[in-house]
Each structure stands twice: as structure tokens, then as C-alpha cells.
Amino acid sequence: MYKLVLNHFLQEKNLNEVYVTPKILSEIDAIDCTSYLKMPMVKKAIIEVFSKNSFLEKMKLHREHKLYITGIKSQVGLCVQMGHKAGFYFDLYKLAYLADHGLINKAIIILPSKNLEKFCNTSSIASYELISKQMLLFKKTKNYKMHLMCLDIKRRT
């Protein structure tokens, strides 16, 4: 049996600012995973945890367009990205739009680890390891505070 772990690399103060509580972390840790796991299953489970903890699901960017981010709580945007790199970069544009319109000032972006990518037997996704390196190029282009978080999988002990 395996479990999901959200690695955040943030101090407790910063976690509180983006509403990632110890309860959310323990609920993610409690998700049981078998040897068969696909990225859509992982994404659904993570969204469910955040939704149960007061994040509103599917934040629509504009009433005339069918564009969404995963969720929002107060002025913190949430994107759970378990897909291709292009989807991640499109999420950045959507978050920037929300920030430009005063709807968010911070964002959490959850990305799978290379380890989780391998476990799910997939490839060419926006892994935390890849994206965190690439984002060093864009430090000064964001109009909101972004926190990348790494979703990993470990054997349950």
C-alpha cells in the first residue's frame, strides 16, 4: 500500500497564508493508493481534500468563457496540475488574469513528482522537478505570490 505526500518546503506561517492546514496535509497523507494509479485519479482525490476544507471548486475566470482554475479560497488560487507542461503554463496565464482583476494575490500550484509520474506509468508531464527549475527564469514576471508544491508517493509504513 502507498500514500500520497504533499511536500511544500514552506514555513508554517506561509502555509497558513495559503490555507494549507495540518488537516489538509494529514487528509492527503491518509489517501490510500494501490499499485494501480492514474493521474486523473490522483487529481480527483487532491481536489476532494481541498474542497472539503473550504476551497471553492472550479473558479470560473469570466462569465463569457469556459475557463477555470481548480479552486479558490479568499484570495488564494489553487491549481492542481497533473497533466502536460502546456497545461501548467496555461494555468499561469489564468492565475495572472485573476491577479490582474484583483481576485487573487497568491496561488498554490500542486505538481506531481517524477516519482509519482513513474508510479502512474506516464511521461511528459509537468513534474515538480522540471517546472521548479524552469520557473527560475520567470521570477519577476508574476503579479501574485506563487507557491509550487510537490505531490509525491511513498510506501505506507
Regions found by a protein language model. Give the residues of each.
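Acidic-basic catalytic patches of nuclease active cores, encompassing PD-(D/E)XK
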Residues: 1-63
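Active-site metal-binding core of divalent-cation-utilizing nuclease and nuclease-like domains
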Residues: 35-74, 84-93, 97-100, 155-156
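Hydrophobic anchor at the start of a short beta-strand
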Residues: 57, 105, 146
